[in-house]
Amino acid sequence: MLMATAVPVANSKPDVDRLKSILPGVPLVESPFFDDILPTCDFDAETARVGRDLHEKGFAVVRFPDEEFDARAERIKNRLAPRFDFAGWRENGWKVNDGLRVQDAWTFDADVRAIAVNARILQILEKLYGRKAWPFQTLNFPVGTQQHYHSDSVHFSSIPERFMCGVWVALEDIGDDAGPLEYYPGSHKWPIVYNDQVGVRIAGAKRRASQELYHQVWEALVEKTHLAPEYFSPRKGDALIWAANLLHGGSCQRNPNATRWSQVTHYFFENCCYVTPMASDMFVGKLQLRRLVNIADGKQVPNVYVDAPYASLGISFRFREFLATMRRSLSPIARKIRH
């Protein structure tokens, strides 16, 4: 009997052009081939570092690239402070792990908007995700959120998934007793959890889904993987970029008299559908599509599915319409059997 002879295979370089092209629906920085592709990219050193950190840990820390940042931060604090009931929060909200916030202050505050549309941040994100980034939401906080760790992907996600990220920036120095941001490095690599996986259906449900439904899943995953949280106690102007599925939240604010002024900007990327998974039955025809405005130009961004405008596809994601279509397609005999 002839025996096959093992032939040693020489180490060959990966076909990077092929690796770049086979997963167009996955952000570059989330690609399993990112380490092979990165050396061939024309990135400056800072962008490459941010990319490596985002890919491996799910977050990256940068100095916010704005020469006017200090003055801008002071103006934001001075303008927004009168909107908050600090005394009431210290008396009641702090004790129940509640926070204070203003959503979408960019609509009336030029400095909030300037942070959201920072050209250098947009440039870094576009290079690392492979699609043009656009800001769609701002949140401004004067104190700690004290919010349970969570993935943003249950609140807003994209199709294809993971074309979303957040940028959190400190508007002042933040101490350890002010409820610093907490996050779980590496958790961004876990699968995104959807309603059906936790036994929740939106259509016909008597209660609305909430983030709390996912808490036990995230807690169990953290326990199983022995993942330890890290905490971000930054200097004014330090910013943290996080990936769509990174578990993050606000730690307990031990000192209710402290402030924790910060701004979060959430970004999507072009040529996606933008959805709210927690309010959707993702795989049976009911999506809560978001109709969002690009903060940079004030224009509504179209939902796009694999290079085609969603509106042009003639697809209905409304569950009742989906069921009605199915019923109309049934034969009279099938309908009789069904009833």
Over which residues does each language-model region extend?
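Short, charged/polar surface micro-motifs in flexible loops or helix N-caps
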Residues: 131, 143-146, 174-176, 239, ...
